Amino acid sequence: MSQRRLFVTTALPYANGNFHIGHIMEYIQADIWVRYQRMQGHEVNFVGADDAHGAPIMIAAEKAGKTPQQFVADIAAGRKPYLDGFHISFDNWHSTDGPENHQLAQQIYLDLKKAGLIETKTVEQFFDPDKNMFLPDRFIKGQCPKCGAKDQYGDNCEVCGAVYAPTDLINPYSALSGATPVLKSSEHFFFRLSDPRCVAFLEQWTQDGMLQTEVANKVKEWFSPRQNVDGTTSEGLDDWDISRDAPYFGIEIPDAPGKYFYVWLDAPVGYLASLKNLLDKKGLDYDAYMADPGLEQYHFIGKDIITFHTLFWPAMLHFSGRKTPDNVFVHGFLTVNNGEKMSKSRGTGLDPLKYLNLGMNPEWLRYYLAAKLNARNEDIDFNPEDFMARVNADLVGKYINIASRAAGFISKRFDGRLGEPSADGDALLEVLRGASPAIQELYAEREYGKALREVMQLADRVNGYVDQNKPWELAKQPGMEARLLDVCTVCIEAFRLLTIYLKPVLPALGTQVEDFLKTGSLTFRDAGASLGSGHVIGEYKHLMQRVDVKQLDALFEPPAAAPEPAQLTPGGEALAAPITIDDFAKVDLRIAKIVNCEAVEGSTKLLRLTLDVGEGKMRNVFSGIASAYTPDQLIGKHTVVVANLAPRKMKFGVSEGMVLAASHADEKAQPGIYVLEPLPGASPGLRVR
């Protein structure tokens, strides 16, 4: 097999927070494929980077009292424990704010401009009147114009995958202030994706059988006329707005002061920038590397960013004169407990760093996710009970068990030296060797679940051989040393083959086994050979613990609830029992003007108010507010009165309503009476609703 040269990436995480389990799942999926390719002897450059630009980072940095650069650097500093902890073998980790990305993004733009695919248009852009700034796409929310989903971002819909302009949103609002944004004009730069050249290229590129069927079918929808929920019709591919206005943390557009590239233009360029950064460190020429006709380029992404990677990205590369991806591998989302969305507060969130800090073996998770992953973009489900059962049964009960049942006899009885398998043992080993091509093909096609099922079926056959021959009984029988050596040798040879087949998924365990068996680094080529008679192995040491249910309980334990706030009694008394809206509607509250006010002779508490309630006649109302107000303080003011309260005959006259005022239940502890007064503009007779 000739050596291939591969350039592999994962989607760039946005640099505004720590990795979540979705990131780790994608990195594990890509890492398994990369390790398989390396075990085939191929040259792989596997790179990642932080997506470091955009208004959300700029705003978050400002809130944190940092520059955007320092904010991103602090996030990047926390990546290593995750990547090392889960054995992710990136060759390089970079940032889209690096000089390589600035240079490459600007050059790609200039090449697209030279190709006649950049144009400017005056657009109406949302502006937050409360924050006094143009709103980034991710700070505008509303209803998707394509499928009608609510609370979607201003640049793309997470439900249907549509990409649109923020102004296309239905019922938009500012995510920063909640205000309804206003439109202001601004000149923007567009990539002419609707150009017939782009359409023809993308129709061919996306439908040539390379992409997953479900992905190709989804992308195909965007080339056809379609009716949107807002009543408009999309005729096909739309031009792509690639600019944003200052203030913005990003890469400046050449010869366009105050204009920056939209983050989704420079983010995928970050793949190339990270590769260039790696090659520069190796002293290799980036341009020569990319010009190699044998170079293969692959991207692993989630299904929520298909449009960017299968339309914009290949078109940008092709029409700027660069290599296009050989494939884009799309995966689904990770759910928990039969499709439930993960939630830390409900105790169903899987925090990858917490997993590591609890001392849980990262290769348990690598194995479990691999056993669920396939070549389609289906969601996969994490079930804690299934996780424990599968890891304990497959890895410990089947795979590790083979070595633990044989290695001790080899070391104690035969000084660690292997023998020669007999005919029945050779037949079993040939079955294992014969499975190698199929297992390799499944890894190549990213059908990890099928590959691991094949491996575990082989492990079952080996364990059946062990159970049939019972080395622990052979060890007790005089004259059976040769058979004992034969059986145990077959077990060790089989264990080595199974280790080769599992090594892309379990790299750390693979290294332990290589040390134990004294084999050197194992590759798939080694599946056709054997350790051989006379080979000396090391002393067996326990290779893997079982999953403990206590660890799982701790992993999914919800965070401690915030202490309950002290129960407050508003105004010094408990709230009244709930009423219905119909109950409230019976009370007719009206705005009243206090035309006159006077003290009541014989009372220290009451004031007599003459009120205009808009009826064309005055009302007489007594109110117990004399301790707080003098008559001259109230005359000419407006207040709120209960207008339909039945007249009440009092010692000093008839009261024809009730003026609303507030006070504390304990007037001695908190003295004060406060008559309600509407804001300016209210007039007598208006109803309070």
Curated annotation (Swiss-Prot):
The UniProt entry's GO CC annotations, sorted and at most eight, read: cytosol
- Write the protein's name: Methionine--tRNA ligase
Tell me where it mainly resides: cytoplasm
Q: Which reaction does it catalyse?
A: tRNA(Met) + L-methionine + ATP = L-methionyl-tRNA(Met) + AMP + diphosphate
> In the record, what terms sit under GO molecular function?
ATP binding; metal ion binding; methionine-tRNA ligase activity; tRNA binding
Tell me the cofactor note: Binds 1 zinc ion per subunit.
- What lineage is on file? Bacteria, Pseudomonadati, Pseudomonadota, Betaproteobacteria, Burkholderiales
Name the InterPro entries for this protein. aa-tRNA-synth_I_CS, Anticodon_Met, Met-tRNA-synth_bsu_C, Met-tRNA_ligase_1, Met-tRNA_synth, Methionyl/Leucyl_tRNA_Synth, MetRS_core, MetRS_Zn
Which gene is annotated as encoding this protein in its UniProt record?
metG
